[in-house]
Amino acid sequence: MSVQNLILSALRRAPRRLVRRIAGPPIEVDGFAMDSNIQILANSAAKRAAPQTYETLSLAQIGGAGNGFDAIAPNRRRNVNIRDVELPLATATLKARIYEPKRASDTDPGILFFHQGGLVIMHHLTDDYFCSLLADECRAKLITLDYRLCPEHAFPAAIEDGLALWDYVHDNAENLGIDRRRVALAGDSAGGLIASVMCQLLRDKATLEKIAQPAAQLLIYPWVSTDITAGGSMESCADMFPLSKATMEMFNANVFPDGKGIDHAWANPLHNENLQELPPAIIATAGFDPIRDQG
């Protein structure tokens, strides 16, 4: 267990009055008050990151900083086994991790999960604990994909990888032990974008040919619009940590260099006028998040 996890564990057991004193004056935005435990962690992380900005770091360094999430994440669920694999998708051979409940069957539901990171940073293991939780609680086989990132790979490479994973899972459902009729899409932040767009594209494709549709979509603080002009949560949460408006500007600059493709429909599923006949959706937003209003 990491030092950060030990601190979190101690904070959970400490009297609330003591925790609030350590946290300092409460952070309040738009009627939301930040949890004292989270405020302590956020303040600590922000102080460590303060000397550096995204303008002075390389993408590799920024991506490495994202690995700090591992330090505060709980341990992976014990009721879940993992397998690290490489999948020969139509777009590329990509790394993936498969989470399987220990009491798995040959016809379990499936979840395809896509990680956060603005389509620019992080990787398929960033949400390791959460993926194990989903697999455990849903009694499903979950596959998280190390999709291709910008700017090395031009947008919409990540979405094309997601669609290729969908096809691969349906073509190999029996070997994977997944019921192809019960496959959901899920993702956080940019991963929510991938899941949302895939649902819309698969819905549209079904008007031309009979194909399976996602059973559900789980969108966790999804990034579903490239519009980051001031206003609403983009303004009130502009200087939050770890996601700020400056970070969003950095993501846009790397995904859409010189603004090329920034209005692409696949980058803006929020503005799709046709939201009919889509899978049931669960949308979770974060109170202190510039893209909160997009959810």
Please name every model-derived segment.
Residues S2-A14, R76, R83-Q294:
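Alpha/beta-hydrolase superfamily serine-hydrolase fold, recognizing
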Residues M1-I98:
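A glycine/proline-hinged amphipathic helix-loop "lid/cap" segment
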